[in-house]
Amino acid sequence: MSLELLKPVSENLLNELDENHLQGSLFNKIKFHRDQSGIPDIDSSNICIIGISETRNSYFESDIQDLNILRKELYKLKEGKWKISISDLGDLSNGNTVEDTYHALYDICKELHSKKITLVIIGGSNDIIYPVFKSFDSYPDKVNIVSIDNQFDLYQDSDIISGRTYMNKIILDDSNKLNDFTNIGYQRHLCSYKEIELMDKLFFEKISLGEISENNMRAEPIIRDADIVGFDTKSLSFSGNSNPNGIDTRLACILSKYAGQSNRHPFLDCLT
């Protein structure tokens, strides 16, 4: 079982959060994969979180990811009035090869999807969406994918699955499982005219950064109807980013909210 490959959440992080007595926070709501207690019972979980640091096929320059920084800030937030169970299953270590990581992630996604559990993945690079997509191979319906990104990732000049070619690989996949693909937040000067022509030829929807900034409601029905939502942090606008234009934090929260309101048990990839 690939769940056994997951490493527990850092005890140092959990102890630090516990010492801060975060009353009413997500930290007190979530069941954690810990050294002593092991993996939580996923059969009673509605949402599972895993961390991934696989970026070897990113295409883009990637820094070493400290997923606990994101966890620390996330778990400080206050819980809502929901009746859902959340489990943090820990981190998936890199395999000996990228393909090993893909295979392990494929198995994890397939198991959780069979139990109708929403999976939130933090970390990794865009190419991990490919094994997530492949995990739908026995799913009766076709798959809708939404990518919140400043580029389309439709490069065709490589046989390797990477952060710039993964969507082209999905489109050409023999399974013919892709129903629809939508990009939200693309920036024209970062996308080749060939990619734009291909998006139009395949009747895939694209919403530019300017369009989504003016009217975020355009994205709501699309995201809520998605099976896979990928949110690439390079689409964000923040100090120090090599691309100063992008989605601001308020809009990022709105788009993430739409993903959380989906009834399709989606996979949400927060790609760093």
Predicted regions located by residue number:
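Conserved alpha-helical scaffold segments that buttress catalytic/binding sites
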Residues: L3-I49, R56-C270
